[in-house]
Amino acid sequence: MEYEVKKGKKGFVSPIRRLVFPKAGRRAACRSSVSRRPLHSMPLYPPDYLIDPQILLCDYLEKEVKFLGHLTWVTSSLNPSSRDELLQLLDTARQLKELPLKTTAEQDSILSLSARCLLLTWRDNEELILRIPTHEIAAASYLQDDALHLLVLKTGLGVDPVPAGVDASPGGAGRDPGPPGGAPEKRRVGTAERRHTICSLDWRMGWGGGAAEARAGGGGGGSLERQRAGARASGSWERRQTFSGSWERRHGGGGGGGGAGKPGGSWERRQAGSGGGGSWERRHPGPNPLDPQDPSPDAYCNLVILAVANRDAAEESCALICQVFQIIYGDQSIECVDRAGYHYTSTPERPWLCSRSESCHTDGTYAYDADFSCCSSFNGSQDTFEACYSGTSTPSFHGSHCSGSDHSSLGLEQLQDYMVTLRSKLGPLEIQQFAMLLREYRLGLPIQDYCTGLLKLYGDRRKFLLLGMRPFIPDQDIGYFEGFLEGVGIREGGILTDSFGRIKRSMSSTSASAVRSYDGAAQRPEAQAFHRLLADITHDIEALAPDDDDDDEDEPRGSRGGSDAAEDNYL
C-alpha cells in the first residue's frame, strides 16, 4: 500500500529517472531560459508589401523562418513555378534524409534581407548558416505542401552550405568558444550590419572590381568567420577565384583546393571523406539520385528550403526579394547605359503589383524569377531586368507576360513613322535632348515643363512635331497636352496633320502608371505594352545619335539650312 501511495503522488520525479533521462529536462529548461531579441523589421501591408528602396539599400529587414535544408546540385532546368516538380524533388529529398520530415524549434532561423544579399542565421545563437549574394539568386518560389508553407530559393552553385567553416547546427563545434573562463558570447553589436557590408564587398568583387585586393589578402575574404577558419575559403566568390571549384576538383585532378583540408559543399564532403558519408550513403552503396549526372557544373543549381508561418509571410518575403531584384538589376542597367555613352534607360517595371484576384493560383505555386543578362543593347531593357510574377507553371520567362500583339503592331507603325520624321528634322544633339526630356517626363517631370521644353527644342518652324507625341501621352495629361497644342496653333486637321493624321490614340485605357511606373497602381496588359513601346522609342532615338554624329562631323553647320529646306518641302 505504501508503494501504491508513493506511486500515486503527482509532481514527484525519481532520481533514477532523472539520471537516466537527463536530456529532456535540460532541453526544456534551456529552451525556456533562452531570450530571443525582437527582429529588426517593420510592418508591410498586402497585397504589394511595398517598402522604401532606401531601406533595402542602406538597411535590412529580418523575417523569422525555419531552415529545413540546402539541396545542392539540383538540375537547373527545374521550374520553380511548377508545383509538381518541386513536390517531387522535396519528396525525394525527404526519402534520402536530406530534408526533415517535420519542423522543430531547433530549425528556427532569421532571414535577413537587404539589396546586396540575403543572410540566414540561427534564431537563438545567430550563427551564420548561409550568405546568399543577390546575383546568386535565380528565383524565389512559394509552395504549400499540406500544412507546410515553404519558401524555396533557387541559387547558383557558388552559395556554400556552411560558409567560413562555421558549424551549421546551433551550438555546433565550429563556434568560437571565446576566452577560457569567460561568459558565453553574446550577439555582437552590428553583426548583421557587418555581414551585409561584407557581402556588398564580395558582390562588387564578384563583378571584377576587387579581385586583386582579394588575392593580395590571401584569398580568405574579409569576414570574421573566414579569418577564423584560416586556410579554407568557402565564400562563393573567394572559392571560385582562389581555388578551383568543387566540380573541377572532382573531374580535373583535384585543382588547387585539395590541400585546404575540407572539401566544398555537402556532396563534395560525402565524396571526399571515407567515413563522413550521409545517412543515405551509409545505407546504400550506390550513387545518390540527387547527385549530378551530367559532367557540367553549369547544368546545376542549389535550392534553399525554408518554412514560414503562413501564406502571407511567404508572399511578403517573395515581394521583398522581387523588389531587391528591381533595385539591383535596375541600377545595373542604368550604369551600363551610362557607360555606353547614352543618357537614358527605361524605368524598371513592377509587375508584381498585382492583386490576388487578378492572378490565378490554380496550382498553389508562384515564383519570382530574375532573368539577368548584362547586354550591350538595351532594346526592351525592362524585359531584361524585370522580375516575373507567374500564377501557373511558366515554361518561358518572357512567355508569362500578357500578349499585346495588336497594340505592338500598331505601335510599331507609329514608332517607325515618328523615327523617320525625327531623323529628318532633328540633329544628333537635339535627338539626345529629346531623349533626356522624355526620360525626365517619365520620372516625374510635370507635363507643363515637358511641353515647354519640347516647344523650345523644336522651335516655331518644327512645332508640328508635337502632334506626333499625342499617342504617347498618358490619360491624366492628355487634356493639358491637347490644350497646349491648340494654344501654340496646332490643330488636328489641315496641312499640319498630314504627317501624323493617321495616328490615333489607340491606347485610351492606358494609365499614367505605364509611363511613370513607380506609383502604386497595378499595370494592365495595355499599360505594359505601352510602357514597352515608350522604351523602344527612346532606345531607337538614342541609336540614331552615333550615326548622326558622323554625319554632323562631315557636314558643317550649313546642313542646318538644308534641314530647314527639307521642312519646307515636308510641309
Curated annotation (Swiss-Prot):
| Gene giving rise to this polypeptide | CCM2L
Compositional bias of type Gly residues: which residue ranges? 212-223, 253-264
Ranges annotated as biased composition (Pro residues): 286-295
Superkingdom field: Eukaryota
Compositionally biased, Acidic residues: which spans? Answer: 545-555
Positions with biased composition (Basic and acidic residues): 184-193, 237-251
Q: Would you tell me the protein name for this molecule?
A: Cerebral cavernous malformations 2 protein-like
Region annotation Disordered: residue ranges?
164-193, 212-295, 544-571
Q: Which family does it belong to?
A: Belongs to the CCM2 family.
